[in-house]
C-alpha cells in the first residue's frame, strides 16, 4: 500500500494540530469531575433573583407589543408554611412551562399568589398562639403575622426547587388591600347584575368550624353508624309504622313519615296519622317516589334537617321547620330530653330511652357515607343543616351557559373536562358565600331585616362595613334600619378572581386587552369543583368570556408505596428532605417523568437515577470542554458520515421534544433525553468520535458543539440549574441560556442512508462488545474480528472502518457476506 505525498502532508498537518494530553488535562482541571448539584443550584438561584436577570429574563414586558403573550394562572397555595410534594409538583410544572415559553419567544407572565385567609390560620392563632377571637384587632394582626411567616418559609422552599416566578411585580396575597379591593368590587358588580342576594334557609353547617359552607366544600366520607328501627304508633288505632333511620337524635324535628307510592306494604297507610315517639306530636304518612323501598323498612322519617333529601321534601310539601341542633352541634329544643348533648351523645341516649319505652324495634351497626366538611382535611367533621340568613351568589340560573361555554377551554388531559361538566350538571344549590369567621375578606354590604343588601361605594373599597357607617341611613327599598354584614367571604370568593387580578380587568385596561383570556390555568383534580368552577363562573359573568384558553390538570403525587401520602401511614415525603443530596434538577426530572393527569408514586431511588443521568451529562460536558469550550466554531464544508448519522438522530430528538413541550408531555422529553443522550450520544457517538476530537476534526467538533448546545437548551426548562452552568462554561454566548432560541433543524434534510448507517453502527458495536465480554476480554483489549452481514451492511461498515478500529481497539477486520449479522473472534486477535 502506497501513500501519496498529499496524504502525508494532510496527515502531518492533522498531527501538528492535535491537542497534547497536557493541554487536555489542563482544560479538564477547569471543569470539576464531580457534579455538585447543591453548589450549582444555589449559585444560579441567587443569580436568577438579581435585578439584572429579572429585567432581562423573567420580567413580563408591558411595553412589548410584538411578542405573543403567555399568562399562567398559577395556584395560590394556602399558607400552611409547609411545601409538600403536591406543591413541588405544580411549582415544577409552572416553572417548566414558563421557561419553555420564553425560549419559544413568548412574553411570559408567571405570577405567584398566596391564599392567605381562612379557618386553618384562625385555628393556629387561636389555639397555638392563644390569641382570643374576641379581641378582633389583635387577632387579625396575629393572623397576618403568622401568614407572612408561612409565606417566607414556602417561598424559600419554592426558590430552592428552582421556581422563578415574577416575585417583583406579580406576587400577591389575598388579604392585601389591592387584592381585597378587586374581590369586593367583583361582588358589588355581581350584586348590580342581580346575582348576589341575602336569603334565609337551610345551609350546610360545620359545627366544628362554626361556619356555613358551600356545596363544593362538602362530600361524603365513610363512618361507622347505626340504623335504628323505631315504631311510630297510629293515632287512630293499634299498631303503627316502623321507620329506619341513621339519625334517631333528630326525632324531635320529624315533620312526616314518607313511603314509596309503589310500595304495596304501605299503600293503604298513606294519609294516616302517627305519633312521634317520646314527643307526643302527630304527623302524617305521605307518599314520595324518592323513598327507597329497599332501605330499612321502606318507611323513613322526614326531619328538618337530616340530609339534603329532607330539604327537598320540606320544600315540596311545605312542611314546618323545627331545629334541634345548634351552631356548636349540640341538641336543643327537646324539652330537656337531650338538650346540651352532642349529636353522638344524643344518638346513644335516645336509643336507650326508646328501648326503655318500647319504641325501639332493633338497632343495626352499619358502615355508611356521611356528609362531611371534606374540603378541609384538617376538619372532616360531619355537617348539619341549619336555618341561617346568608349571602348567596346565584349559580343555578347560569347552568346552561356554563355547560356550553366550558367547551371553549382546552383541557389537558381532555378527560378532565368531564369532572367539571358533571359538577355543573349536578349542582343543587346556589353558592353560599357567607362565612362566620374573622380572618377573611369582609362582605361589602349592609342589610336590613327584610334581607335587602346595600353595597359599599366603590370609591372607598376595600372596606369593612362593621367599622364605618352605611352610605345611607335607611334601606332605600323599605325604610328599615341598616346593619353591617359581619360575615366574611368564602375563601373561594378570594381565589376565584385570580385571572381578573392578573390581567388587570379592573385597573389596567391595556394589560387586560393584551392578556385576557389568560393562556393557561394549572391546578390539581381536587379543586376542579372549587377553584376551577368558581373562577370559570365568575369570570364568565363579570368579563363575559372564559378565563383561560387552556386548563392543565395534574395528577396526585403518591407515597413510595403507591398510596396517598398520609402522616398516619408514615409515607409522607417532603421535596426538601434530600434536595441538597440529589439536587432540585433531579427532583424536577422525577416529578415530570409521568403523564400529566396521572397519579404516580414518588421514590428517592428514582431521583437518584435522575442524578446519575445529570452526572452523565456533566461528564459529557467535561469531555467536550477542551474541544468546544467558548470557541467560535463554523460548520465545515463536508461532514463525516458518523456525524451525518447523529444529526439525523438529533433532528428527531429536537422535533419530538419541542412537540412534547407544546403538548405538556414532559415525560416524553425526559424519556427522549434518556434514549437519545444516554443510549445514543454518551454510549455510542462520543466513543466513536473521541479519536477525531483529539485530531481537532472540524466535523466532529462542529457536530458535538451543536448537539450539546441544543440538548442543554431543550433540557433547560426541566433542569435549569445544570444547563445554565454548562451553557455558561461551554458557550456563554448570552448572559443566560434562557435568552437562546429553540433549536432549529430546518437545515437538516432527511437522510435515509445516514439513518441506516446509524442502525448498522449500533449493531456492529454491540456485537463486538458482546464478543469481548463473552471471551472475558477487557474492552480495551486489541482483537481482530470477522464481520458477517448483507452486502449493504458490509458496504456501510467499511465506510467507517477506521472509526470502528480506533473506538473498539480492532487490529484487523475481515468481512464475509451473510444474511445474518454476526461477529467472530479471529484466532490471532492478540498478536
UniProtKB/Swiss-Prot annotation:
ATP binds at residue 567. It holds the Pfam family Anticodon_1. Its main location: cytoplasm. InterPro entries: aa-tRNA-synth_I_CS, aa-tRNA-synth_Ia, Anticodon_Ia_Val, M/V/L/I-tRNA-synth_anticd-bd, Rossmann-like_a/b/a_fold, tRNAsynth_Ia_anticodon-bd, Val/Leu/Ile-tRNA-synth_edit, Valine-tRNA_ligase_type_2. It comes from Sulfolobus acidocaldarius (strain ATCC 33909 / DSM 639 / JCM 8929 / NBRC 15157 / NCIMB 11770). GO terms for cellular component: cytosol. The keyword Oxidoreductase does not apply. A motif ('KMSKS' region) lies at residues 564-568. CDD domains: Anticodon_Ia_Val, ValRS_core. The keyword Ligase applies. This is Valine--tRNA ligase. Keywords: Aminoacyl-tRNA synthetase, ATP-binding, Cytoplasm, Ligase, Nucleotide-binding, Protein biosynthesis. It is found in: Cytoplasm. ValRS has two distinct active sites: one for aminoacylation and one for editing. The misactivated threonine is translocated from the active site to the editing site. PROSITE patterns: AA_TRNA_LIGASE_I. NCBIfam families: PRK13208.1, valS. GO terms for molecular function: aminoacyl-tRNA deacylase activity; ATP binding; valine-tRNA ligase activity. A motif ('HIGH' region) lies at residues 77-87. Belongs to the class-I aminoacyl-tRNA synthetase family. ValS type 2 subfamily. One of its GO terms (biological process) is valyl-tRNA aminoacylation. Its EC number is 6.1.1.9. The gene is valS.
Amino acid at each position: 500500500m502506497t501513500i501519496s505525498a498529499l496524504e502525508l502532508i494532510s496527515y502531518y498537518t492533522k498531527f501538528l494540530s492535535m491537542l497534547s494530553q497536557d493541554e487536555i488535562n489542563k482544560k479538564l482541571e477547569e471543569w470539576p469531575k464531580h457534579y455538585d448539584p447543591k453548589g450549582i443550584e444555589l449559585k444560579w438561584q441567587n443569580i436568577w433573583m438579581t435585578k439584572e436577570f429579572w429585567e432581562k429574563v423573567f420580567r413580563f414586558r408591558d411595553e412589548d407589543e410584538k411578542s405573543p403573550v403567555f399568562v399562567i394562572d398559577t395556584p395560590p397555595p394556602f399558607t400552611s408554611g409547609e411545601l409538600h410534594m403536591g406543591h413541588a409538583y405544580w411549582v415544577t410544572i409552572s416553572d417548566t412551562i414558563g421557561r419553555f415559553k420564553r425560549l419559544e419567544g413568548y412574553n411570559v407572565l408567571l405570577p405567584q399568589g398566596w391564599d392567605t385567609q381562612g379557618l386553618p390560620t384562625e385555628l393556629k392563632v387561636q389555639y397555638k398562639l392563644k390569641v382570643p377571637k374576641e379581641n378582633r384587632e389583635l387577632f387579625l394582626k396575629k393572623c397576618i403575622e403568622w401568614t407572612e411567616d408561612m409565606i417566607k418559609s414556602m417561598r424559600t422552599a419554592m426558590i430552592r426547587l428552582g421556581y422563578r416566578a415574577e416575585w417583583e411585580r406579580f406576587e400577591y396575597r389575598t388579604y392585601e388591600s389591592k387584592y381585597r379591593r378587586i374581590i369586593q368590587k367583583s361582588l358589588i358588580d355581581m350584586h348590580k347584575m342581580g346575582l348576589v342576594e341575602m336569603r334565609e334557609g337551610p345551609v350546610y353547617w360545620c359545627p366544628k368550624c362554626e361556619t356555613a359552607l358551600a356545596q363544593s366544600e362538602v362530600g361524603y366520607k365513610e363512618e361507622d353508624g347505626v340504623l335504628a328501627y323505631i315504631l311510630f304508633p297510629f293515632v287512630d288505632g293499634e299498631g303503627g309504622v316502623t321507620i329506619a333511620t341513621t339519625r334517631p337524635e333528630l326525632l324531635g324535628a320529624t315533620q312526616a313519615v314518607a313511603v314509596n307510592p309503589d310500595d304495596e306494604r304501605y299503600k293503604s297507610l298513606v294519609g294516616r296519622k302517627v305519633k312521634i315517639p317520646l314527643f307526643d306530636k302527630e304527623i302524617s304518612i305521605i307518599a314520595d317516589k324518592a323513598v327507597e323501598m329497599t332501605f330499612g323498612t321502606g318507611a323513613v322519617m322526614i326531619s328538618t334537617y337530616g340530609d339534603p333529601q329532607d330539604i327537598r321534601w320540606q320544600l315540596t310539601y311545605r312542611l314546618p321547620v323545627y331545629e334541634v341542633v345548634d351552631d356548636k352541634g349540640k341538641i336543643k329544643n327537646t324539652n330537656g330530653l337531650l338538650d346540651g348533648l352532642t349529636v353522638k351523645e344524643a344518638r346513644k341516649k335516645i336509643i336507650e330511652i326508646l328501648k326503655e319505652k318500647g319504641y325501639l324495634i332493633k338497632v343495626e351497626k352499619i358502615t355508611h357515607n356521611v356528609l362531611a366538611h371534606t374540603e378541609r382535611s384538617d376538619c372532616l367533621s360531619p355537617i348539619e343543616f341549619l336555618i341561617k340568613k346568608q349571602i348567596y351568589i346565584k349559580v343555578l340560573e347560569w347552568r346552561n351557559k356554563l355547560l356550553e361555554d366550558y367547551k371553549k377551554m382546552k383541557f389537558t388531559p381532555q378527560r378532565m373536562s368531564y369532572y367539571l361538566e358533571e359538577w355543573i350538571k349536578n349542582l343543587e344549590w346556589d353558592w353560599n358565600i357567607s362565612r362566620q369567621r374573622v380572618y377573611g375578606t369582609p362582605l361589602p354590604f349592609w342589610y336590613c331585616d327584610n334581607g335587602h343588601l346595600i353595597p359599599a361605594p366603590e370609591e372607598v373599597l376595600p372596606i369593612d362595613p362593621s367599622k364605618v357607617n352605611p352610605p345611607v341611613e335607611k334601606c332605600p327599598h323599605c325604610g328599615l334600619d341598616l346593619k353591617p354584614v359581619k360575615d366574611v367571604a368564602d375563601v373561594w370568593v378570594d381565589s376565584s378572581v385570580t385571572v381578573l387580578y392578573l390581567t388587570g380587568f379592573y385597573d389596567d385596561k391595556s394589560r387586560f386587552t393584551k392578556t385576557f383570556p389568560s393562556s393557561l390555568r394549572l391546578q390539581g383534580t381536587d379543586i376542579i369543583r372549587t377553584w376551577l368552577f368558581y373562577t370559570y363562573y365568575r369570570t364568565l359573568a363579570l368579563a363575559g368570556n372564559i378565563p383561560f384558553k387552556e386548563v392543565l390538570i395534574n395528577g396526585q403525587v403518591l407515597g413510595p408505596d403507591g398510596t396517598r401520602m398520609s402522616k398516619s401511614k408514615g409515607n409522607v415525603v417532603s421535596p426538601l428532605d434530600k434536595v441538597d443530596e440529589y439536587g432540585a434538577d433531579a427532583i424536577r426530572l422525577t416529578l415530570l417523568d409521568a403523564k400529566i393527569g396521572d397519579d404516580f408514586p414518588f421514590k428517592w431511588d428514582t431521583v437518584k437515577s435522575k442524578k446519575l443521568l445529570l452526572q452523565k451529562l456533566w461528564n459529557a460536558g467535561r469531555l467536550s470542554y477542551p474541544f468546544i469550550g467558548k470557541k467560535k466554531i463554523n460548520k465545515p464544508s463536508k461532514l463525516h458520515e458518523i456525524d451525518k448519522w447523529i444529526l439525523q438522530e438529533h433532528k428527531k430528538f429536537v422535533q419530538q421534544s419541542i412537540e412534547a413541550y407544546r403538548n405538556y408531555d414532559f415525560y416524553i422529553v425526559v424519556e427522549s433525553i434518556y434514549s437519545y443522550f444516554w443510549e445514543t450520544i454518551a454510549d455510542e457517538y462520543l466513543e466513536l468520535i473521541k479519536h477525531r476530537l483529539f485530531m481537532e476534526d472540524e466535523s466532529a467538533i462542529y457536530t458535538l458543539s451543536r448537539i450539546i448546545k441544543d440538548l442543554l437548551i431543550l433540557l433547560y426548562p426541566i433542569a435549569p440549574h445544570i444547563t445554565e452552568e454548562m451553557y455558561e462554561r461551554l458557550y456563554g454566548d448570552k448572559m443566560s441560556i434562557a435568552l437562546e432560541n429553540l433549536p432549529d433543524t430546518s437545515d437538516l434534510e432527511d437522510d435515509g442512508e445516514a439513518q441506516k448507517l446509524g442502525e448498522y453502527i449500533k449493531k456492529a458495536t454491540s456485537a463486538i462488545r458482546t464478543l469481548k465480554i463473552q471471551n472475558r476480554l477487557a474492552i480495551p483489549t486489541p482483537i481482530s474480528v470477522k464481520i458477517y452481514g448483507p452486502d449493504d451492511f458490509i458496504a456501510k461498515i467499511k465506510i467507517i472502518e477506521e472509526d470502528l478500529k480506533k473506538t473498539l481497539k480492532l487490529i484487523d477486520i475481515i468481512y464475509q457476506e451473510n444474511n445474518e449479522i454476526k461477529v467472530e473472534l479471529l484466532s490471532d486477535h492478540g498478536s
